[in-house]
Amino acid sequence: KVGMMGFSAGGEVVSLIAYDAIRDANSKDAIDRLNGKPNFQILIYPGPLGIPETVTADAPPAFFFFLNNDECCSEPLLKLTNAYRKAKASVELHLYSVDKHAFNMGNRSTYASIKGWPQRLTDWLGDNGCLKK
């Protein structure tokens, strides 16, 4: 399986690809005939660009991690989560109340919940068969 992961603006790039993977079945270029949609996506406090209003049931399974007090980024991801729910697409949401935007891997955070988020991601990857050899 091939997935995509993005933090902040990188999350916007993942969204643009995951929900608008354009392919041209009639292209002379073999690469352009392929579907570029990832098998799964991981959005960590993504920016608002590229977040669609709706998703379909075949949207890439998603892991979302962000902060409630992140002024730029929490509302669009809550809307996206609801779009996933309406489409009955696979989504896991981790919404935390503390810390600030750009906490990265959580190593510098003073909050145990933020420091532990990579393990939540590892659990999700395992539960979804993404770590099988």
Where are these predicted regions, by residue range?
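Conserved alpha/beta-hydrolase "acid-adjacent" motif
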Residues: E71-K79
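Primarily recognizes the serine-hydrolase "nucleophile elbow" in alpha/beta-hydrolase
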Residues: K1-D58
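Short beta-strand/loop motif that positions the catalytic acidic residue
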Residues: F63-F66
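Non-membrane alpha-helical structural segments and their capping/turn regions in soluble enzymes
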Residues: N35, S74, K115-P118
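Acidic beta-to-alpha connecting loop that harbors the catalytic carboxylate
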Residues: A9, N68-E71, V98-K100
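C-terminal catalytic histidine-bearing segment of alpha/beta-hydrolase fold enzymes
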Residues: R85-K133
